[in-house]
Design a protein with these regions (language model features):
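Conserved class I S-adenosyl-L-methionine
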Residues: 1-26, 37-41, 120-142
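Class I SAM-dependent methyltransferase SAM/SAH-binding core
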Residues: 29-79
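A short acidic, Gly/Pro-enriched loop at the edge of an enzyme's catalytic core
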Residues: 77-88
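A short SAM/SAH-binding and catalytic strip from SAM-dependent methyltransferases
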Residues: 87-101
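A short glycine-rich, Lys/Arg-flanked "PGG" loop and its adjoining helix->strand segment in the class I
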Residues: 103-118
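Short alpha-helix
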Residues: 152-166
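C-terminal helical/coil "lid" or tail adjacent to the Rossmann-like core of SAM-dependent
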Residues: 171-227
Length: 245
């Protein structure tokens, strides 16, 4: 259950809110709002927040949990707004977008901000879950298959360059190590099942089971201690301003 087992995802987003500098009452878009918990948190601190997500399931969950808030369906890569936002906020979403789609997504964000508006985000950064992906790569290789990391984890340098090419002024960037405890004895197996989908497409169920067992066994010596699994998260946190035209 994503809402219960991975509640650390929105929890980290609450800390990210601290680098928003727009005044209370500002219009803020929560881009990739998921279950809406951060849209509510943005509202709680005084922003006029709107949540946007491409997932019907997430939007249904968000509307059920927070019926008083405004949620819209939209794709981060291509979205438009009638009225520009003072800030666009995004937590743990950008690395789900294919790397080739990021320039277009940044253009959509830029166009949806007023001049001087802020884009504040955090996502998986360079080195994110590197130990987990290495273990999966080794396990796939032992079954004569190639593993490809199904997410885009940029460096500060390549993402700052992309933002600047779009017309943003980058004013803050950090790569943060964030080792994160996972729930229960099956925490690592559950994490792989929840977040690693694409590489297993077309893989027979029994082979998938063997690959996961091998990866988990491989990771036990580095990411399991005191009866707790830890995911080796690295987060890219950035803040950029849309320049005045």
């Amino acid at each position: 259950d994503y809402n219960n087992n991975y509640s650390f995802v929105p929890e980290f987003g609450r800390d990210l809110m601290s680098i928003l500098d727009v005044p209370k009452g500002s219009r803020v878009l929560d881009l990739g709002c998921g279950n809406g918990s951060l849209t509510q948190a943005l509202t709680d601190v005084g922003y006029e927040a709107v949540g946007m997500d491409v997932s019907d399931d997430f939007l249904k969950s968000a509307r059920a949990r927070y019926p008083h808030l405004h949620f819209v369906e939209g794709n981060a890569v291509n979205f438009e707004t009638d009225e520009p936002y003072d800030a666009i906020f995004s937590n743990a979403m950008l690395n789900w977008i294919n790397d080739e789609d990021h320039p277009q997504m940044l253009k959509s964000v830029y166009d949806a901000l007023r001049p001087g508006g802020e884009f504040v985000f955090e996502c998986g950064g360079f080195g994110n879950n590197a130990l987990i992906h290495r273990a999966l790569s080794n396990a796939f290789a032992s079954h004569h298959m190639k593993y490809q990391v199904p997410y885009y984890f940029p460096t500060i340098g390549n993402y700052a360059t992309m933002l600047e090419k779009t017309g943003f002024r980058v004013i803050y960037a950090a790569l943060l190590d964030r080792p994160t405890p996972l729930l229960g004895e099956s925490g690592m197996r559950d994490w792989i099942s929840m977040f690693i989908i694409k590489p297993f497409m077309g893989v027979a169920p029994d082979v998938k089971e063997k690959i996961i067992n091998e990866a988990v066994s491989d990771l036990r010596s580095v990411l399991y201690s005191n009866k707790t699994w830890t995911a080796d998260y690295v987060r890219l946190r950035m803040k950029a301003i849309r320049l005045y035209d």
